[in-house]
């Protein structure tokens, strides 16, 4: 899973969260922290060619207060983050979209470069440490 990953070689289109699920599908999640953040953001459709599934994630308080005003296309899923437990619930599943093979390859390479310990631009990079909780 990566945060703030550039999805296109042009411009500044960066997805909040990019992950690969168990089926090998690329999933992009756009995090919305408040109503204004969601209401003014009209770029979600630009992410669709770069993923198999696309989700918006809202806090439980934002979802409870504005779910009737949040209108999304059928292809977008909704995740709700609990402010008390920190768990995420899929309120609405995302449709599974097909990706162009060349785009999928490019996304996998972007994730691999991001995870690598070496960058041709920055020399040796820091090693990522993943902690397991029990």
Give the residues covered by each predicted segment:
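Gly/Pro/Ser/Thr-rich low-complexity, intrinsically disordered segments predominantly at protein N-termini
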Residues: 1-16, 36
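Active-site beta-strand-loop-beta-strand hairpin of nuclease catalytic cores
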Residues: 15-28
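Non-catalytic C-terminal interaction segments of nucleic acid-processing enzymes
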Residues: 3-5, 9, 67-134
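Catalytic cores of nucleic-acid endonucleases
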Residues: 26, 33-82
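Short glycine-rich, polar/acidic loop-and-turn segments at beta strand-coil junctions
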Residues: 5, 19-21, 32-33, 60
């Amino acid at each position: 899973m990566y945060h703030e990953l550039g999805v296109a070689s042009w411009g500044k289109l960066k997805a909040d969260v990019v992950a690969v699920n168990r089926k090998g599908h690329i999933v992009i999640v756009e995090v919305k922290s408040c109503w204004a953040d969601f209401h003014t953001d009209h770029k979600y459709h630009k992410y669709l060619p770069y993923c198999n599934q696309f989700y918006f994630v809202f806090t439980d308080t934002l979802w409870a207060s504005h779910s009737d005003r949040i209108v999304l296309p059928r292809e977008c899923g909704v995740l709700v983050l609990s402010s008390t437990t920190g768990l995420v619930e899929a309120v609405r599943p995302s449709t599974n979209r097909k990706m162009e093979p060349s785009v999928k390859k490019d996304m996998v390479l972007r994730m691999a470069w991001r995870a690598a310990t070496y960058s041709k631009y920055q020399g040796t990079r820091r090693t990522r440490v993943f902690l397991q909780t029990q």
